[in-house]
Amino acid sequence: MRAPDFWWRDPPSLPARLLAPVGALYGAAAARRMARPGAPAPCPVVCVGNVTLGGAGKTPTALALAALLRELGARPAFLSRGYGGSLPGPLRVDPAAHGAAEVGDEPLLIARAAPTIVARDRPAGAAACAAAGADVIVMDDGLQNPSLRKDWSLAVFDAGVGIGNGLPFPAGPLRAPLGAQWPLVSAVLVIGDAAQGRPLLAAAAARGLPALRGRLAPDAAAAAALRGRPVLAFAGIGRPDKFFESLRAVGAELRGTRAFPDHHAYRAGEIAALEREATRRGLTLVTTEKDRVRLPAAMAVAVLPVRLALAPDDAALLRARLAALLRGRAGP
């Protein structure tokens, strides 16, 4: 689905106020569900999540955490629900054998970096991670899922939108009332403009939570290849506008944009229309890494990957927290 604009307007607009009673019921049900005790995992669980629906930068953050854990000598594996995929799991993702329709787009992307297990049953998925040789699990999303006990949870925020109008779905973007979500959070990561992120950093500090700052940095080689090139950009992610702005920032000549819903399954007709327009106008098609795995392998399309870049002090703090976690829990 595509997030409605009124989610991000504060104070809440008329559509949000009309939906607020439904949001209150949804939020109360979510809060009750989140209060259930989780099953223990066979090794430490690091959860990367967010308090809102939509894109915040969780996948680049999960990849960065796995890289840090490897530097610390750990053997991380990713655990994902496999949103958008048809296979319930638990199964290990093989990018050469599985498609996004089977396991979801995010698992295909992160499986290039570390063993990745897709499982709707999170405790069963955690057992599969351990069987695959992992001694620490990076749970991609799942902050609100109570089925598996987490040892450390990082809540990722987009500084540009924050918590929107502060209301639960469908009146706003919150997955549950904030009061029910804060106790689940071990640390906060705010991605984007530092000035816009100050209220979030202050809210974390008021709760005694470590608050990290980061940005999504485009891959240097891909950025150089796109600089000065006329492009037709398309994306089916939580906030396509962020991707389009990244292209402008690296110097691509943005001649057209096409936004699709998050996790969009591209149809043959849509792909053909994009290719025809790009050919007719002499443009290069460009999309995100996450969209690329949902497209035919033979399709000619450029990609602008991004990675999480942290302020040096925050990178050191994150490394120290992960090292302490590994020292403090070596088993179930």
From Swiss-Prot:
Residues where ATP binds: 52-59
GO terms (BP aspect): lipid A biosynthetic process; lipopolysaccharide core region biosynthetic process
Record-listed E.C. numbers: 2.7.1.130
Keywords: ATP-binding, Kinase, Lipid A biosynthesis, Lipid biosynthesis, Lipid metabolism, Nucleotide-binding, Transferase
Enzymatic class: transferase
Top-rank taxon: Bacteria
UniProt-recorded Gene Ontology molecular function terms: ATP binding; tetraacyldisaccharide 4'-kinase activity
Pathway linked to the protein: Glycolipid biosynthesis; lipid IV(A) biosynthesis; lipid IV(A) from (3R)-3-hydroxytetradecanoyl-[acyl-carrier-protein] and UDP-N-acetyl-alpha-D-glucosamine: step 6/6
GO cellular component: plasma membrane
Catalytic activity annotation: a lipid A disaccharide + ATP = a lipid IVA + ADP + H(+)
HAMAP family in the record: LpxK
Function recorded in the entry: Transfers the gamma-phosphate of ATP to the 4'-position of a tetraacyldisaccharide 1-phosphate intermediate (termed DS-1-P) to form tetraacyldisaccharide 1,4'-bis-phosphate (lipid IVA).
Family statement: Belongs to the LpxK family.
NCBIfam families, sorted: lpxK
Protein name (Swiss-Prot/TrEMBL): Tetraacyldisaccharide 4'-kinase
Species whose genome carries this gene: Methylobacterium sp. (strain 4-46)
